[in-house]
């Protein structure tokens, strides 16, 4: 009974809506990674901002609890290959950029693996349910792929895309061979 609680936004909008260079850089990033709207980009920027905020807080925290939290932050960022250094420091976390997170999206990974010809086609395959991760169908293009799941991205077995002679697959394979 009663109304469900109102969920908060998972992103922060820009402080000023009409800054030309920000709009231009957002447009370039959106085209490169096949994002449909700016909200997807703002969600990833907010996630990066939260990681950086946590790192800034941990730089000033010299207690043992601060050390444990730093190790946990490093483990999360390493799990998703956002942070690739062997001996990471909090300065490495502060130097991360938006591309390091966008590279780990399922949409980008499907495109980079050659399962789709373009980033937009990769998005379509994911939304239509043609892509599986670890044998499970994933329909969210913004799903962050962990390092353990890198090699487990494939077509869903009962999908028409799983057929080797599907027109879209043969076109993608012939383009790779040229």
Swiss-Prot record:
What the entry lists under InterPro entries is as follows: Ribosomal_uS4, Ribosomal_uS4_arc, Ribosomal_uS4_CS, Ribosomal_uS4_euk/arc, Ribosomal_uS4_N, S4_RNA-bd, S4_RNA-bd_sf
Task: Name the SMART domains on file.
Answer: Ribosomal_S4, S4
S4 RNA-binding domain location: 104-166
> A GO BP term, please?
ribosomal small subunit biogenesis
User: A single GO molecular function, which one?
Assistant: structural constituent of ribosome
The residue stretches assigned to a coiled coil in this entry are: none
Gene Ontology CC entries for this record: small ribosomal subunit
Role this protein plays: One of the primary rRNA binding proteins, it binds directly to 16S rRNA where it nucleates assembly of the body of the 30S subunit.
Q: To which protein family does this belong? A: Belongs to the universal ribosomal protein uS4 family.
The protein, known as: Small ribosomal subunit protein uS4
Please tell me the species this chain comes from.
Methanococcus maripaludis (strain C7 / ATCC BAA-1331)
What gene makes this protein?
Answer: rps4
